[in-house]
């Protein structure tokens, strides 16, 4: 009897220690000390075996710390061990979404929804379809999510983005009006309604939305850009110039803003419009690095075509290269050589003549061009052309 009592007390003490250890792990997690929590859990599993509650804590540590691969392995195992626990499947869905495995996220999400219509799951399935640009399916799930939780700004914003893309402005206005009637200061939905109002040419109403955002402390590019657009549409050109300049101060990457400011200043017969056109033209200049890389790509393509006897492709690629690098004069005699190999001696002669003046006397390029001209003239003489 004493032995049995001792065993019971022993196991109770082990259970108590395990509970204390688990409490300590959870405290570490609350302090975002996930590495320490994982180390403790690993030691506990070595001593106690892979108990489900330990595996769950370990999976959560990996999930919270962003270690998606380990979290995916752990939650896959847990979902097999406890198939009725939806939390594990929700985490799997989230991990697949994080990893851009959208089909897998959709499949798991649909399985969850057969058991429970969870708003967040509906939304995430919609997000997965949206990432795949399957807008109709995304719209359906967003609408289902809103049917269960109508006042959801995140889902409403995503649904309205789809509707704006289809120019369904009236429906966007109906949805956003209803939302803003309850929450008029919402900085997520106000700009959505403002854009829809602007698209419907309700410029005063659109201006009111963006001004309200500004009054609420929103002072970003989009606010001033649309205030500028509204002012311009209403003929308030000074106001438009001011707002577009404020937009430019916040984001100087939109060449159309620079062009608009230049036009507004010019139309007002004021000084300084040239500066804004210069800004715009500078922005419109292609990136020299991109030009160089593109020219090199066409040159390499041409050389490969030449080596493989595809002279038509070689000619086409050298001509494209000259669009990006017109001073690459060697391309002229390379094109000439291709036409020569195609026995199109007249065209070859023209290209050798084009190449000749670009090379100085005594240079290798000049020699290639001049001997090429001599050969082509001889060929044409024998052909009586």
Task: Please place each PLM-identified region on the residue numbering.
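Helix-start (N-cap) detector for alpha-helical repeat units in TPR-like alpha-solenoids
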Residues: 51-53, 86-87, 118-121, 153-154, ...
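Terminal, low-structured helical/coil segments at or just beyond the last alpha-helical repeat
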Residues: 286-295, 300, 307, 349-385
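Register position in tetratricopeptide repeats
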Residues: 30-31, 64-65, 98-99, 131-132, ...
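Structural marker of alpha-solenoid helical repeat scaffolds
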Residues: 47, 81, 114-116, 148, ...
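N-terminal leader/linker segments that initiate helical-solenoid repeat arrays
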Residues: 17-76, 80-84, 97-100, 107, ...
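Canonical tetratricopeptide repeat
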Residues: 57, 91-94, 124, 158-161, ...
